[in-house]
């Protein structure tokens, strides 16, 4: 009798311990994780708030505010390209082509930032020159029709075709070397899985070759990025859909990926930290996607990297939750200062201490050195909270958002009476 190699585990608490055990089990089978540079933990400003119609001048005019608030990365999102597939520069925005894009990256660098570029690999719009000149790149269905990506108006390219891989490797070199970007933001709900390919031009041994080749496709992108720019940031955002464990070795930043609530930010953080460990940064995505559009606490409290897509109201004609009003700017200043001071994104996330489904209030714990950090979340809470994971010693407890002392606790399983609305973030330091 021969079976597939199988992982079986008995749960203790929620899913965190089992997923972490699975990661360790896979590493013993030769599974390797990516490595992230130290600057990957810097806060991110993304130009997506300006939409696909973003203009270079809007980016330039926003940089002083981005710098004053303390962000480390500037991301140029969707809208720089002529179309999805050809990935040439929009001539209306970059009339001098590569020289204009390089000048933008140089300007971003001169202001002290790292530069990241949005890109959606493995898809192409129907009227792209790529598909006109290379229709044999397409991933085809059993009846010979092109497979459409459900969200984009695009067709799948086949990751098992060597020419498709080489085309994308050349794009990586252009983005990171010719234009000078420091990182990639890979985006698209099609990135975590592709259908079987029946394109006869690809000479597949079986239609499922495309499915099995997908992790190797992203390996090629990641390894090319690291070869041409060691330490390059490769963020992987599957647009609100699930991640594939087998692509995880091939990117060095995970993300909450278009969350629709703050709970999704926190639960995705717990899941991805279990599967990828603490050395790979988790980006909480743009704060505008969280509850109220301003819930930095959910990202900071779980050890995530903070980010935003804010716009300057004076630079847009349509206004919304991305507008950086004076009140929001004060809030941003406070949370960016907290993020930089604590840098919990570099701490050890202790997901095994609390059950996200049954422990009330919802609690997350991070150890950094000898200090413990706890994040409590509830619509409204008045009562005791348990501080798990402490040693048999005395600790001082402080609300690190307000700076207010909450007293002292002692020993294992310490309890603390608290009252809060929404969230409470505390630092527990040995005396």
Predicted regions and their residues:
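Conserved structural scaffold segments of CAZyme catalytic domains across common CAZy folds
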Residues: 1-116, 122-125, 129-130, 137, ...
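Composition- and surface-driven signal marking solvent-exposed, interaction-prone regions
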Residues: 19-23, 59, 210, 386-390, ...
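Short, surface-exposed loop and linker segments with low hydrophobicity and enrichment for Pro/Ser/Thr
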Residues: 37-40, 206, 210, 418-420
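Short, acidic/polar
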Residues: 53-68, 164-177, 292-296
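Aromatic- and carboxylate-enriched substrate-binding clefts and catalytic-loop regions
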Residues: 70-282
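Active-site-proximal substrate-binding groove within the catalytic cores of carbohydrate-active enzymes
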Residues: 217-404, 415-417, 424
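C-terminal beta-strand-rich structural cap/linker in extracellular carbohydrate-active enzymes
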Residues: 407-431
